[in-house]
Amino acid sequence: MFWFYQGVATYLGQTLGVETHITQSQYDPLQDPMMLQDQIDIAFICGLPFVQLNRIIPGQLQALVAPVMQASRYQNRPVYFSDIIVKASRNFRFEDLAGKTFCYNDPGSNSGYNLVRYRLMQSQYPSSFFGKVMQSGSHQRSIELVVEGIADCAAIDSTVLEQQLRFQPELANHLRVIESIGPCPMPPIIISSRLANDSQKLQSILCQPNTELASNSMKQAQIRRYVSVQTEDYAPILRMYDDVIQAGYGILG
């Protein structure tokens, strides 16, 4: 989706009459020096590191907008799911994944890791439920590992899975979603509190995009629209995170 983020950054720059620079961070969000030192104005970020950063640097960041995806499953709301996938030939239910190999993108991912921990905790399965747990580095790689049979299952951001199925429709013959965890607040665009006075203007620009952004980049990304969100909207993610940590589900496997 970096191509889409570039499109949004270009649109903001053109609309505001400023030069924009977008980079893909190589750091864990919780250790990103630019983020921690308030050197980033606007960021696209997963909901879990966002709420965690608000504990580390309280008041420095605030949620601005979040996308509403086009698919009917999102019910015209800024939400998404964690889709649990298995190989199409495997007749698994979630409970059948006990002792199997689970693949996730990153331990800081809400959809790839945190929601799975919460699902195990809610069902009173142990943190050692999976026989083997492996990190892939990305949702796309997790999908590949399941297709290749290296992993039995993976937790995938539903919007990423939909995007991959559009780009590679043949994947539908190799994968099956056995359960969807959620809905959960959609990853937001956030801003530094230094820009708080401009937040309404930025929200208006993104929630009422020009034809080029709406018809090209947003349509291709299957985004129906952007809506304004508040930092408080992401509190449920932090509560789930706190619950799994307190219950001893910090590390799976």
PLM regions and their residue ranges:
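Bilobed "Venus flytrap"/periplasmic-binding protein-like clamshell domains
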Residues: 1-15, 25, 48, 76-143, ...
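An extracytoplasmic/periplasmic, membrane-proximal ligand-sensing/linker region
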Residues: 2-3, 7, 184, 191, ...
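A short beta-strand-loop structural module common to alpha/beta enzyme folds
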Residues: 19-27
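Short, hydrophobic alpha-helical packing/hinge segments within bilobed ligand-binding/sensory domains
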Residues: 30-34, 49-50, 141-145
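Acidic, polar ligand-binding/catalytic clefts
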Residues: 34-96
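A ligand-binding cleft/hinge motif common to bilobed small-molecule-binding domains
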Residues: 44-58, 121-122, 147, 152-172
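Short hydrophobic/aromatic-enriched beta-strand-loop microsegments
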Residues: 61-66, 129, 154, 174-177
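Periplasmic-binding protein-like
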Residues: 66-83, 169-204, 223-233
